[in-house]
Regions:
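Internal glycine-rich alpha/beta core junctions
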Residues: 1-7, 35-38, 66-217
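Amphipathic alpha-helical coiled-coil segments
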Residues: 26-44, 74, 81, 88, ...
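A short small-residue
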Residues: 17-25, 60-62, 130-138, 180-184, ...
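Leucine-rich amphipathic alpha-helices with coiled-coil/heptad-repeat character
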Residues: 44, 48-51, 85-88, 92-95, ...
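Glycine-rich cofactor/substrate-binding loops
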Residues: 1, 185-373
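A helix-coil-helix interface module used to build multimeric assemblies
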Residues: 1-97, 101, 107, 112-116, ...
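Glycine-rich cofactor-pocket loops
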Residues: 49-71, 171-188, 219-225, 252-266
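Generic amphipathic alpha-helical segments used as scaffolds and interaction surfaces in large
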Residues: 17, 21-24, 28, 68, ...
Length: 373
């Protein structure tokens, strides 16, 4: 542009520019991840519908605790990702703040039209303290903190799947492209994609720790330490995006074999709490008394004395098959259809919300390009 190009720099600093560009880049990445989260939620709802009538083991203290519909498991993770979605949407409020005009630290004497600039960039026109606008990276750490929480939950899901695949053997069928064989042991089937997801979870948590460790030691104002934070953050986001794709496909291709699951649960009294609650409600007996009574029966039952349990059930006029299906009378189990429909309706509303955000950003981009051609 020649010598006149020297005028472009007035009222501008790399510090407020990079703070703005970083917000815009993060906003794009967050929206990409939001789309992936919505896709995972749809897959989880589909699985809840598919396995609504199939029994599934639920654990506490790494032991089978209770039984329930497999839909409950998938709806649990759908709720988790719904919460993550809400957090990510909330993070957009921080990313939409406009630091332009803040100069290097305390602002510029040049009066910028913040309303116009903000409108063109789809940013808020809220006036920020310049020192905060250029010297804070809380918005960056906040986004990575939310994404780290998502990875925490993914890490737990990975552990769940590894435990279930080993416990249920062929009860959980995993797609072949998620499995690798051993180079020397022909019997091995390794869940390699989940192992990678587990490693990436640890990487992201380590990266968050690195970001906070760098940030805590930086005196206020812009410092080049921030540049190192950017690299760490965007490498983590790449890992997160890849992991979300792995998990989505893993869940979508997962199959449960009901007969194998039932066989696995045969010698595990996951119905014990349901049974004493049921007897307490129909007999009026104190539940602690029933707890002690059934505990003694189960001590014998678990070492092979089946007759002790039969006598207990006969005493309260309960059939063996009835015991296995007691979980179905729980309020949540009886309202599974309603819970699934609620999750689906909520997802559809969230999809509309994101569509509106994307359409708004598209209009801003078109206006920006049109104005500066």
């Amino acid at each position: 542009v020649g010598p006149d190009g020297g005028r472009i720099a007035i009222g501008r600093s790399r510090n407020d520019h990079i703070a703005a560009v970083l917000r815009l880049a993060l906003r794009d990445k967050v929206l990409d991840i939001i789309h992936k989260v919505l896709e995972i939620r749809k897959v989880l709802i589909d699985k809840a519908v598919e396995y609504k009538d199939k029994v599934f083991p639920f654990y506490t203290h790494a032991q089978v605790a209770q039984c329930g519909s497999a839909a409950q498991y998938f709806l649990t993770y759908e709720q988790i990702f719904t919460d993550i979605y809400a957090m990510l949407v909330h993070s957009l409020d921080y990313l939409n703040k406009n630091p332009l005009g803040s100069g290097a630290a305390t602002g510029s004497i040049v009066q910028l039209n913040l309303d116009e600039i903000s409108k063109e960039l789809c940013l808020s026109a809220e006036i920020l303290p310049p020192y905060y606008a250029t010297g804070s990276r809380l918005f960056l750490i906040y986004v990575l903190f939310i994404l780290s929480m998502a990875m925490l939950e993914i890490g737990r899901f990975v552990e769940d799947m590894m435990l279930l695949v080993n416990a249920l053997k062929h009860g959980v069928e995993v797609a072949k492209h998620h499995i690798s064989t051993s180079s020397i042991m022909p019997h091995k089937r390794n869940l390699v994609t989940l192992e990678i997801a587990r490693a990436k979870t640890s990487k992201v948590l380590g990266a968050l720790s690195a970001l906070m460790s760098i940030y805590k030691s930086v005196p206020y104002g812009y410092n080049l330490d921030f540049q190192e934070m950017n690299y760490i953050a965007f490498e983590s986001i790449k890992d997160i995006e890849e992991t979300l794709e792995i998990i989505k496909d893993f869940i979508a291709t997962l199959e449960l074999k009901e007969e194998v699951v039932k066989e696995y649960l045969k010698d595990k009294p996951c119905w014990s709490s349901d049974l004493i609650e049921y007897i307490a409600t129909i007999s009026g007996k104190p539940i602690r008394e029933l707890y002690a009574e059934l505990a003694k029966v189960l001590q014998k039952y678990l070492v092979g004395d089946i007759s002790s349990l039969k006598e207990f059930l006969t005493r309260y006029s309960i059939g063996e098959e009835e015991v296995q299906s007691l979980y179905k009378i729980k309020p949540f189990e009886k309202s599974l259809d309603q819970a699934i429909n609620h999750a689906l309706n909520r997802l559809q509303e969230n999809l509309k919300e994101v569509k509106r955000v994307n359409e708004g950003l598209k209009r801003c981009n078109e206006m920006l390009i049109r104005n500066y051609r």
